[in-house]
Amino acid sequence: MSPLNCIFPPRLRRIGHLLSCFILLPGLMSCGVANLINSPTATPTATITPTATATLTPTPTLTPTITPLPILCGGPPVMFILLVGSDGRAKSYSVGLADSIRLVRVDFVEPSIHLLSFPRDLYVEIPGIESHGGITHGKLNQAYLYGNPGYGYNEDGGLGSGLLARTLEHNFGAQVDHYVAINLQSFVRIVDALGGIDINLPFVVDGRVKGSKDSNLYFSAGKQHLKGYRTMLLARMRPFGDFQRAQVQNLILQALAKKMLKRSVLHKLPELIDASKDSIQTDIGVVEGGQLLCLASKLNAKNIEFVSFPETIFKNGRVQDSVLGNTSIVEVDFNILRIYTQKFNQGTQFEPEEGLMDGNQR
């Protein structure tokens, strides 16, 4: 299957079949009429005197109207949230790269959440910071770094997440309404506040260097319960590369969502949010937060899907960067990525990530 074919799910293919039926229908009808016109005429046996018949007034045809679905929880039809996992180890968000980058599409009409992962090593144009050392390009995760207060390159607000959002929009046409950034310390506290997570790993993840016996860095395949610190370690490991790490991160996010949607936890969410409000960086206000909490009560695990770009459209490369020097990057045809992102914006998702079909959704 070509990369572009992956964009169109079975739902669109079914629509294509329906359109074909409508195209063929006039041809079938005209065929039937032609047969009636060209059939031989029998010799009349009697002349029938016509009688007067009443002319019926045609009944006007009513044009069907489509009733739009209601928008739930007082929210907008769709809300886009940039979710950033920062590798910053301090309590503040003054420095740090974007360790994970997810664009979240929240649908308030057909209650659902979709998360799209962007490779952090994409080499992109970073807008608006050329006056700082002539920087025009960098890795996608550097856009978050340059916008943080420790660098101060971002002069348009929104800190690191704001510059990262503008970079995603500039390069790929991504839409971002709000952002949430979580650093390592905050992530550990959130997982522990939830009582840990239950995850089903489809493969062994071993982050130990040769000769190391640190059991914290070894994760067996299968079901297991993890607390905050080990969950953070698992999220950061990439023994198989960045794409497999993104897959594991999605499994962790899925396990977190599943835990948060439990009735025993859902009613505690306001307390959890209040307890973590000083350790999470976000521009989501009280109104939007209330809308999201309301929608959460209408969701289950089946309403949350993780989608990803097919790995086959990417390749590893190297570039001479003004800051990093000769560095490894991820290369891709930006036009293809823009098409995927546009489909995501519109709610026409491509197939859910295959790696998630391992039991965590059951």
Identify the function of each model-found stretch.
Residues L4-N5, C21, H114:
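Residue-level detector of alpha-helical hydrophobic segments embedded in or interacting with membranes
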Residues L4, G27-S30:
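Terminal accessory/targeting
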Residues L18-G27:
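Bacterial N-terminal signal peptides
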